[in-house]
Amino acid sequence: MTIHIALLRAVNVGGRKPIIMAELRDLLTELGFVDVRSLLQTGNLVFRGNARRGIDLERLLEEEAAKRLDLHTDFFVRNAEEWKAIVANNPFREEAKRDAAHLIVMFLKCTPSAKDVEALRAAITGPEIVSADGGQAYIVYPAGIGRSRLTNTLVEKKFRTRGTARNWNTILKLASLAED
């Protein structure tokens, strides 16, 4: 069985799209997945299931969450090997060591073009640094995320796709859960 990590977009953030993690775990169990675990209350799941392409699994989870839980949101799924590569390919290792909370990985529905990445970089007005790698973007927020004008909305607009972000601490915790 393949280990998968699923991230939900914008749940339990600022009172939007409230969901109880136990309900999500139960949903995945009802769908036939095993060893379903969650991390934090922001929609992070680790589970085992038969090998499927990430996009097929995302579609299944989105449809079933909408139908059974009335939860309309995006799911972003990576398998454990892909997750290891995300950790290994971090272009900002020094920044991660210095302040892991100020490094995020934004998971994207579609891979941005080089032109879109350059458009985002050109739109940055602060000290933020962006590096895109396939379906992920690594973003360093030296002055903190809360004060930055580089918002998820701006990233999505410039990349022309939806995404969800997790800080480096959460990325590493999910990597550890996927190894257990």
Feature names for model-found ranges:
Residues 2-42, 46-180:
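Surface-exposed, charge/polar-rich loops and edge strands
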